[in-house]
Every structure is written in structure tokens, then in C-alpha cells.
Amino acid sequence: MARIAGIDLPKKKKIEYALPYIYGIGLTTSRKILKDTGIDPEKRVYELTEDEVSILNKEIQSNYIVEGELRKIVQLNIKELMDLGCYRGLRHRRGLPVRGQRTKTNARTRKGKRKTVGAKAK
């Protein structure tokens, strides 16, 4: 099993589709990495040689921010928005949708389970 950027890639998948298992690498980036390194995208992960794995590792480590480092940067960006007190930061703080979605109905994923409100007494 090839271990790239601290992630074990699935053996039987083509390398082109296995690289996106790494946080921060999508299909487009995966294709770009393979083109830059000259590795055949049709190759399966178990077919990679040690040299190819090390080339991929070097390429990703030197040119891309992935996994834990990227997660930390994203969290810091969200924290900065919250500290600034801007609209997006307030939405993050309140646990509501950030990108302008409606909240009268829907938004259950972001808001969590429904809170039952008692009926008013007359």
C-alpha cells in the first residue's frame, strides 16, 4: 500500500483517482501532479514503484499544502472571521449557513436537531 502525505491510498484504484483521498487534492490537482511528475494516470496504486512513490511525495510536499496543515489554515481563517465580527463570522459563531441560504425552512444540517417550542397558553 502506497503511503503518500501520511495517507494510505487504496491499492486497487488508479493513481489518478486515489490521490484525491488526500485532503487538499482534488481530481484536477491529481491530474496536474501526475502530468508534472510524468507518471501514467492509468497505473494502479499497487503497480507504483518506490521511486514513483517518493517522486509523488516530494512533489506534493514541496508544491502543495495538504492534510493537517491545510485543515489548520482553514480553521484559523474561520476563527479570524469570527474574531473580526463580520457577517460571515457571526454566521459561523451562531452555527447558521454562511453563504446566504434560506433558514426559515431547511438548513437542518447546520442548525442541528429541531428544538421543540411549547404551545402558548391562552
Swiss-Prot record:
Membrane-spanning intervals of the chain: none
GO molecular function, one term: rRNA binding
SUPFAM superfamilies assigned to the protein according to its UniProt record, in alphabetical order: S13-like H2TH domain (SSF46946)
A biological process term (GO) from this entry: translation
Top-level taxon in the UniProt lineage: Bacteria
Chain residue ranges for the region called Disordered: 98-122
Keyword entries, A-Z: Ribonucleoprotein, Ribosomal protein, RNA-binding, rRNA-binding, tRNA-binding
Matching Gene3D superfamilies: 1.10.8.50, 30s ribosomal protein s13, domain 2 (4.10.910.10)
InterPro entries named in the record: Rbsml_uS13_C (IPR027437), Ribosomal_uS13 (IPR001892), Ribosomal_uS13-like_H2TH (IPR010979), Ribosomal_uS13_bac-type (IPR019980), Ribosomal_uS13_CS (IPR018269)
Keyword Transcription: no
Family the entry assigns: Belongs to the universal ribosomal protein uS13 family.
Assembly with partners or alone: Part of the 30S ribosomal subunit. Forms a loose heterodimer with protein S19. Forms two bridges to the 50S subunit in the 70S ribosome.
UniProt-recorded name of the protein: Small ribosomal subunit protein uS13
Protein's organism: Nautilia profundicola (strain ATCC BAA-1463 / DSM 18972 / AmH)
